[in-house]
């Protein structure tokens, strides 16, 4: 065996040199020799055996590789000390070889190359017998240390050598006891243990101490082993690749466990690695999976002893801990363990494959690249995918697909190709065509696909294709946004919707009956049906505005239905009835109709009517009482004329307010209806036309028999049925659906409501509430009370020594915009209508209009001004006379306070606030008080969060400045406002906590002021606006003088007088 080992050693020498990492391979040869020596019983003299010890010297390069194999044997010994002893008993013959000759042979690595001659020497056995046992014991201790000490571990791994070859079986016999001990750790150690024992017997006995002593010297010999490993690299990595996948499977990372399993782990790997000399390296690489975990630890241990290669060698034979794990240099690749077990990083092509897979996106990579399949297979996939789309199971659930089908069940092939799953297969339309060409489930026609069996069964009738044209058009006409008033009118009326739905359906039960039935209650698209229902509800005022639309709309939406009714008298009678209703409603119920409109448009009012844009602001005409005698004298005295002005009663104010409404309507009517005068004249003639002969009447109204369809309405209208269909339509702004005559109210030309309803083009009037709710005139109502000098009162300018003089003010909305001219403030005429005349800074008398209030306004000295020019004049006067000295400026403050409540304009508000605060800083608080009144009443009417924040901010500032008026207005707002869950400033809440009643806001008048309050005819109109708070406020106080607006009797009286303006009347209430 020794001779065989020697030739192996020389042959292995180059191999070992080729793979420095696989020193274990060469080492197995020397180990085999050493082991064979002991097995043969002679070999001690054999220098070759000791040259295998030089092989130990080679492991000695690692520093402890040789020792590591011995420790495995020793490991077996540690498994049982008796094992070591038994080993020694077996090797008792070896003691003579313990002589240093082993060490002598170990140092010369060249002797290893010349192993063939020395191998026959028998002393090798002797050496193994004597030296290995003591060495084993020592190495056992070393292994114990190695478990905790990385350096010995490295030595062990480096000493690992899969040199055990065929001679191993003989070796196995003597160390079977050790093997058993190892088998206890690992069942596979039986084969490896003898090998290691034999190796340890020869090499360890002779060179254990030497290897430990001269480990570094042996490292020098390692370099020779490096080239040996080079030869092994190509074979090892390949096998390693296969083995790597298994490496992660074996969890042997804990060095302590390895120490415990020293014998067992190497035993499992050693047999595999030891079996074939050259193949042994490969198997060892395969065994590396288990070593894999140990490799990591061994790498740490072996770092000091020759790097990864040394660690491999040490593992090759060392059974203690990573004996054959890293064999074949596999450990060098452990960096890639976590990534690719097969060292894919080393192989370029494999890396490319992974790259492709990682960056794969079907939209960016062609299907051919992704799916490496032939065209036929790809076509089959495409066909199956699309056939699935058209399968019964899918169509029963896929409503999207069915809605996309046309009447014949076809779907565009482009739609199918756009599905993601099809795109993942291919984006080539031609390929899809080719794939579906021979399909038995679907068929292709031009560029469309459908199911072969019962294709027409699946399409779902969708609105997109057929219904869109009809439903789109009808829905537009029917939707409340398009015809808002009509929809709500019908529903708001006392259940007219149900009769409508019943009555019109039978009349229109033809092909469009379904469509008509649905929109009847919602739209004007079915005016005829609605007209019948309206006949029943003739008295309803709302139908009138919508009905004119109805006759037109049906012509577009349901032309077929109209012709059917046109020949019948129903249509005409319906139209006639509707027209008559319109006339009847316009007579007096237009007020209600307007009121309903306003109620209906309440939401829109909040958005539009309560706000006004800058262009509309430029259309405002201010109506003020500004003759020279009304001007304030330098000394602050007023002429007696103010008394007559202040005495204006609520009735007179109401008349003037109505007059301003009429005036505004005239402005708008004359602009948009230049023929209005002619129509009005004809309307005046309607009264005379009533005298028409019966023949003429029948000619003009060929279908008076409205009774069959409209039994109730015909009575009243007959009295005034006249041939004025065209004129009536013009007057009422309604289209002329037919030439049917309508009766017109005799008072139409004088009815403000009539004109109000007939001026839909007015930007504000049609949206505003009636005159009682949206006043045009803000009068100052006089209080006949005298001031009690000693009575507590509110701290306000009206109670000051020099109270401001408040003036009546009104406004109208002109039909034309009067843009401000910055060049001058002269009285140059503006763009106003001829009726209005020129509006300049110079007051202009009101033009004559058909209303008694005209004379009242004229007699009381009211003049009109373009708003922006009047504002300019006020600002100039304020600048000229000084802050707080301009009566016109105070009138402008008062106007803003009232106007902004119903017609908010951001720019106007900001200017109002700025000027009021500027005046307050100078000690003139009238503008600020007007601002607080606007805050309190305006927010109560239309809450705006940003304004509410300003209200809180200014209230805090006002209170901290020692004033109570702002806090009182805020307190009143919180009490009477409907707004809930308001976020109030904590500081303001603290201030409010001091005031529980309205009386708490009254303070004793300052000394010297009592005599100055003889005359307080003017009461800030903005302060009281008839708010219902007055009762509670007034009730809290007894009657007081003028200086105390909160008094009960006076406050209530003024409220009653101011009912005409509801919130806008200038009443004396506690709010003031």
From Swiss-Prot:
The lineage of its organism: Eukaryota, Metazoa, Chordata, Craniata, Vertebrata. This is La-related protein 1. Residues 933-976 are annotated as: Interaction with 7-methylguanosine mRNA cap structure. Residues 106-121 have a biased composition (Pro residues). Residues 59-69, 175-212, 232-263 have a biased composition (Basic and acidic residues). Phosphorylated on multiple Ser and Thr residues in response to active mTORC1. Phosphorylation is important for interaction with RPTOR and the mTORC1 complex. Phosphorylation promotes dissociation from the 5'UTR of mRNA molecules with a 5'TOP motif. Interacts with PABPC1/PABP. Interacts with EIF4A1. Interacts with RPTOR. Recruited to the active mTORC1 complex via interaction with RPTOR. Inhibition of mTORC1 activity strongly reduces interaction with RPTOR and the mTORC1 complex. Identified in a complex with mRNA, PABPC1, EIF4E and EIF4G1. Found in a complex with PABPC1 and SHFL. Residues 1-17, 122-132, 562-571 have a biased composition (Low complexity). RNA-binding protein that regulates the translation of specific target mRNA species downstream of the mTORC1 complex, in function of growth signals and nutrient availability. Interacts on the one hand with the 3' poly-A tails that are present in all mRNA molecules, and on the other hand with the 7-methylguanosine cap structure of mRNAs containing a 5' terminal oligopyrimidine (5'TOP) motif, which is present in mRNAs encoding ribosomal proteins and several components of the translation machinery. The modification Omega-N-methylarginine is found at residue 213. Its main location: cytoplasm. The modification Phosphothreonine is found at residues 196, 351, 503, 626, 701, 746-747, 759, 762, 765, 774, 822, 842. The gene is Larp1. Residues 70-550 are annotated as: Required for interaction with PABPC1. The modification N-acetylalanine is found at residue 2. Residues 740-756, 1031-1053, 1060-1072 have a biased composition (Polar residues). The modification Phosphotyrosine is found at residue 754. Belongs to the LARP family. Pfam families: La (PF05383), LARP1_HEAT (PF21071). GO terms for cellular component: cytoplasm; cytoplasmic stress granule; TORC1 complex.
């Amino acid at each position: 065996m020794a001779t065989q080992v020697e030739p192996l050693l020389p042959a292995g020498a180059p191999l070992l040199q080729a793979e420095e990492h696989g020193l274990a391979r060469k080492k197995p040869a020397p180990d085999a020799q050493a082991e064979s020596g002991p097995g043969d019983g002679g070999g001690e003299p054999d220098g070759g055996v000791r040259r295998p010890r030089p092989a130990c010297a080679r492991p000695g390069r690692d520093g402890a590789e040789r020792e590591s194999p011995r420790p495995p044997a020793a490991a077996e010994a540690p498994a049982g000390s008796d094992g070591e002893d038994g080993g020694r008993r077996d090797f008792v013959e070896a003691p003579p070889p313990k002589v240093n000759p082993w060490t002598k042979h170990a140092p010369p690595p060249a002797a290893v190359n010349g192993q063939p001659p020395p191998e026959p020497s028998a002393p090798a056995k002797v050496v193994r017998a004597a030296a290995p046992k003591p060495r084993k014991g020592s190495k056992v201790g070393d292994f114990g240390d190695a478990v905790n000490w990385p350096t010995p571990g490295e030595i062990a791994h480096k000493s690992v050598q899969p040199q055990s070859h065929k001679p191993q079986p003989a070796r196995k016999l003597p160390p079977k006891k050790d093997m058993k001990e190892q088998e206890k750790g690992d069942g596979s150690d039986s084969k490896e243990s003898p090998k290691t024992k034999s190796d340890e017997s020869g090499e360890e006995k002779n060179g254990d101490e030497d290897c430990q002593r001269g480990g570094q010297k042996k490292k020098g010999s390692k370099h020779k082993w490096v080239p040996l490993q080079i030869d092994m690299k190509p074979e090892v990595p390949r096998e390693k690749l296969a083995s790597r996948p298994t490496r992660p499977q074996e969890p042997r990372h804990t060095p302590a466990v390895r120490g415990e399993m020293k014998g067992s782990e190497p035993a499992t790997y050693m047999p595999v690695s030891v079996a074939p000399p050259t193949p042994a390296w490969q198997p060892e690489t395969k065994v590396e999976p288990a070593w894999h975990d140990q490799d990591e630890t061994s790498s740490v241990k072996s770092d000091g002893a020759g790097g990864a290669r040394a660690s491999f060698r040490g593992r090759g034979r060392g059974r203690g801990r990573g004996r054959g794990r890293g064999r074949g240099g596999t450990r060098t690749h452990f960096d890639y363990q976590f990534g690719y077990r097969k060292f894919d990083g080393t192989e370029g092509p494999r890396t490319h494959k992974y790259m492709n897979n990682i960056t794969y996106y079907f939209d960016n990579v062609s299907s051919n690249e992704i799916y490496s399949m032939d065209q036929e297979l790809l076509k089959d996939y495409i066909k199956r995918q699309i056939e699935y789309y058209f399968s019964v199971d899918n169509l029963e659930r896929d409503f999207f697909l069915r809605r996309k089908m046309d009447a014949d069940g076809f779907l565009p092939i482009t739609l199918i190709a756009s599905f993601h799953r099809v795109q993942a297969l291919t984006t080539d339309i031609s390929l899809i065509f080719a794939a579906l060409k021979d399909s038995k489930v679907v068929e292709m026609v031009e560029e469309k696909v459908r199911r072969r069996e019962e294709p027409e069964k699946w399409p779902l009738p969708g609105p997109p294709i057929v219904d869109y044209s009809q439903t789109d058009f009808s829905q537009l006409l029917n939707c409340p946004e398009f015809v808002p008033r009509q929809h709500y009118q019908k529903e708001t009326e006392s259940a007219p919707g149900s009769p409508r739905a019943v009555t019109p359906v039978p009349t229109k039960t033809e092909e469009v009956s379904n469509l008509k039935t649905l929109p009847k209650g919602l739209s004007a698209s079915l005016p005829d049906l609605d007209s019948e229902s309206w006949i029943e509800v003739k008295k309803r005022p709302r139908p009138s505005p919508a009905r004119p639309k109805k006759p037109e709309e049906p012509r577009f939406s349901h032309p077929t239905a109209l012709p059917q009714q046109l020949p019948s008298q129903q249509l005409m009678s319906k139209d006639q009835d509707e027209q008559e209703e319109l006339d009847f409603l316009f007579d007096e119920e237009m007020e209600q109709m307007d009121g309903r409109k306003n109620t209906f448009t309440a939401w829109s009012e909040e958005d539009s009517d309560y706000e006004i844009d800058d262009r509309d602001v430029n259309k405002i005409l201010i109506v003020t009482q500004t003759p020279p005698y009304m001007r304030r004298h330098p000394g602050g005295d007023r002429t007696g004329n103010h008394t007559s002005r202040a005495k204006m009663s609520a009735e007179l104010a109401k008349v003037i307010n109505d007059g301003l409404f009429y005036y505004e309507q005239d402005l708008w009517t004359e602009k948009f209806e230049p023929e209005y005068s002619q129509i009005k004249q004809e309307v005046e003639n309607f009264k005379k036309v009533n005298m028409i002969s019966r023949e003429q009447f029948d000619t003009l109204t060929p279908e008076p028999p409205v009774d069959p369809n409209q039994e109730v309405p015909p009575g009243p209208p007959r009295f005034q049925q006249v041939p004025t269909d065209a004129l009536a339509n013009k007057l009422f702004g309604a289209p002329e659906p037919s030439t049917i005559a309508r009766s017109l109210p005799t008072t139409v030309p004088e009815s403000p409501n009539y004109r109000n309803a007939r001026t839909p083009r007015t930007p504000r009037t049609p949206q505003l509430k009636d005159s009682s709710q949206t006043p045009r005139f803000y009068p100052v109502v006089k209080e006949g009370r005298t001031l009690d000098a000693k009575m507590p009162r509110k701290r306000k300018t009206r109670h000051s020594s020099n109270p401001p003089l408040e003036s009546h003010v009104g406004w109208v909305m002109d039909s034309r915009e009067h843009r401000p001219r910055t060049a001058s403030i002269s009285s140059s005429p503006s763009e106003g209508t001829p009726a209005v005349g020129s509006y300049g800074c110079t007051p202009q008398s009101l033009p004559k209009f058909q209303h008694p209030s005209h004379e009242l306004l004229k007699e009381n000295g009211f003049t009109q001004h373009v708003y922006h020019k009047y504002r300019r004049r006020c600002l100039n006067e304020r600048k000229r006379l000084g802050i707080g000295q301009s009566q016109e400026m105070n009138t402008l403050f008062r106007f803003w306070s009232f106007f902004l409540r119903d017609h908010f304009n951001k720019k106007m508000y900001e200017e109002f606030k700025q000027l009021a605060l500027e005046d307050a800083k100078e000690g003139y608080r009238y503008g600020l008080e007007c601002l607080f009144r606007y805050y309190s009443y305006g927010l109560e009417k239309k809450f705006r969060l940003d304004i509410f924040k300003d209200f809180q901010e200014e209230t805090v500032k006002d209170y901290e400045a020692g004033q109570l008026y702002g806090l009182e207005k805020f307190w009143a707002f919180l009490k009477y406002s409907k707004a809930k869950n308001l976020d109030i400033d904590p500081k303001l809440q603290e201030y409010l906590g001091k005031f529980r009643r309205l009386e708490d806001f009254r303070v004793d008048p300052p000394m010297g002021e009592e005599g100055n309050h003889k005359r307080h005819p003017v009461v800030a109109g903005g302060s009281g606006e008839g708010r219902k708070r007055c009762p509670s406020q007034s009730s809290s106080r007894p009657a007081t003088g003028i200086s105390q607006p909160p008094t009960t009797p006076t406050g209530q009286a003024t409220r009653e007088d101011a009912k005409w303006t509801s919130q806008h009347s200038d009443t004396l209430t506690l709010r003031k």
